[in-house]
């Protein structure tokens, strides 16, 4: 019952009975909670006389009060809590744990006793000490001494003491990931007294950490071959090599990497072996194992026969700065194929020396890539170029000179030779840093180096598309700075050098060949996709038009660049020197320039800006003169019945390359040339109506048929009225009512003569937007 409830009940029950009932109830309350009130407390005056407070007042010492029914236990604060009565623990619910009774001590109660550390905390500390190599704890030194000593002795000592060791039982990996407290089958030190013979908590934590570390190392180490001296499946197995001491874990860039791998490896199931060893071991070392070792020579054709002859020399390939770390597997399973994941180990960089090779070459460095790490189909022979001449190579009898290309850059450091260029019977000495006795080998599956030595690409994907182009490795044996340097090839003689694709390995041309034209900046008018909508599918280009196709295309404005590079007539080839005037007339269909030539900026196809050309004001043929800004009919096909095109000449100029007389023009579109063709719903054009456009183009003057006239609506109506009068036999008007002005009148050469054929007169009322395919009735 709370204090407020206790206080309110006596007030409600007092009523008219006086003050005796509250006092009696208060007396009963005091019998139950007299412990909570200090004896000798003065009574309050009035009707509260005799009542006492059930809660401690301010500035008064605390006394143990009766515990409440609800309680929250803080396990880490139990040792510093005050003493509790014995009956307090008995009244707690059975589901709550009972706190340990504090031991009586004669010391100062203000100094709290240090609690015992849990096993999980000790396990974590011991594991951190092992991984981080901390020297500040004595348990770490003991663990290192036990690890450095005889493992059998430590196992016997653990077995004698009855403690848990890694040799008795190994917990599962799933238990290891859940928490380090599951490693110990022993109860926690706080749960009960430690039995005799059990290891100390710190000792047990050290053993747990060592077992965890050993299990984590065994996941990354390859499986050992089973001991079998008899023949299995017709093949004899060799006994495993003696154990090597457990390696230390150096720190490189803030990460722990194994410095050496434990156990011997042979076959495809084995992972990367250690970095140290003699030449019989599969992986190289920084120095030769002995000066008296003199391996025998062996041809290249037998390189693939030995199981240990083609080990991957990855320290040589990456200059001692990168290695492949295999993917760790579960204990008891075969190690999977390692991933090509580059790391930075801490093994020393091998200092290589020149090798005595036949033929007096410069420095030869053996580079072998085996099939265990990646499915590579080629083996490389690295030839150092430290002593070679600048911009060349030193010829040697064993390598034909035709298979090598001169190195132009003086900073090049080495060459890679194709396996086809090396004779199969040429012996190679064993390099002092490598374990394999074969410096190079040949592969019949891939003709040439189609893939790089460190690229995870299969042979079937590479194919034989490279054509045996040897590649250049731009690093020497001292080391290489990055993998990006492996992308520079050294092609064969007669082929242009181009950077190789980093994944495919084949050369990719960076610039177009000499036969390919360099892309130029085209104007929007020369885009085939845009022009295809402007021109009808039934229209044909003029026979001599540069903007049309001579292969029977339906649009006259497509493939101009291809037509512009060809002459106007197939029988007359292009020439650089000028031709005589008589032959030029024949080439231009009889049209010759009139007047003095002048330099002028004109529109030229495939040019971003107007170009300066030798220009003329007019051309003439058989007494007919065509000037600039006149409209002409252009041939649209080989037949005379083909409907000609209508264009307005903007410039007449001479081609400086061929001497051909050209013209810049603006096209007029007929109704059938519009997008959608002649549509009565869209407009109701007249018979000779055309639509102006801003479509610029160039063409030869040889395709001009004759001169025509394009009139406005008023001029066309006047022309039709005069033609009707002449048809009816009425005389034409002789005198003008108003004399014409010289400034505003039409020039005489653009005035339509009276005897002009009506088929040569056209009406233009609107402008056609060829880019969007619409008619502009009110152009701006």
Swiss-Prot record:
Alphabetical keyword list: Chromatin regulator, Chromosome, Nucleus, Phosphoprotein, Repressor, Transcription, Transcription regulation, Ubl conjugation
GO MF term list: chromatin binding; transcription cis-regulatory region binding
GO cellular component, one term: nucleoplasm
Domain BAH: 624-779
Pro residues composition bias: residue spans: 94-103, 347-358
Modified residues (Phosphoserine): 8, 101, 121, 184, 206
Modification after translation, per record: Ubiquitinated in a FBXO11-dependent manner; leading to degradation.
Region feature (Disordered): 1-62, 78-300, 320-358, 514-589, 731-751
Biased composition (Low complexity): 120-131, 263-273
Sites bearing Phosphothreonine, chain numbering: 588
Subcellular location: Nucleus; Chromosome
InterPro entries: BAH_dom, BAH_domain-containing, BAH_sf
Coiled-coil zones: none
Pfam families in UniProt: BAH
Biological role stated in the UniProt entry: Heterochromatin protein that acts as a transcription repressor and has the ability to promote the formation of large heterochromatic domains. May act by recruiting heterochromatin proteins such as CBX5 (HP1 alpha), HDAC5 and MBD1. Represses IGF2 expression by binding to its CpG-rich P3 promoter and recruiting heterochromatin proteins. At specific stages of Listeria infection, in complex with TRIM28, corepresses interferon-stimulated genes, including IFNL1, IFNL2 and IFNL3.
Self-association and partners: Interacts with CBX5 (HP1 alpha), HDAC5, MBD1 and SP1. Forms a transcription silencing complex with at least CBX3 (HP1 gamma), HDAC1, HDAC2 and TRIM28. Interacts with L.monocytogenes LntA; this interaction, occurring at a late Listeria infection stage, relieves transcription repression, mostly that of interferon-stimulated genes. Interacts with FBXO11.
Domain notes: The BAH domain is required for localization at H3K27me3.
The protein's name: Bromo adjacent homology domain-containing 1 protein
Organism from which the protein derives: Homo sapiens
Lineage: Eukaryota, Metazoa, Chordata, Craniata, Vertebrata
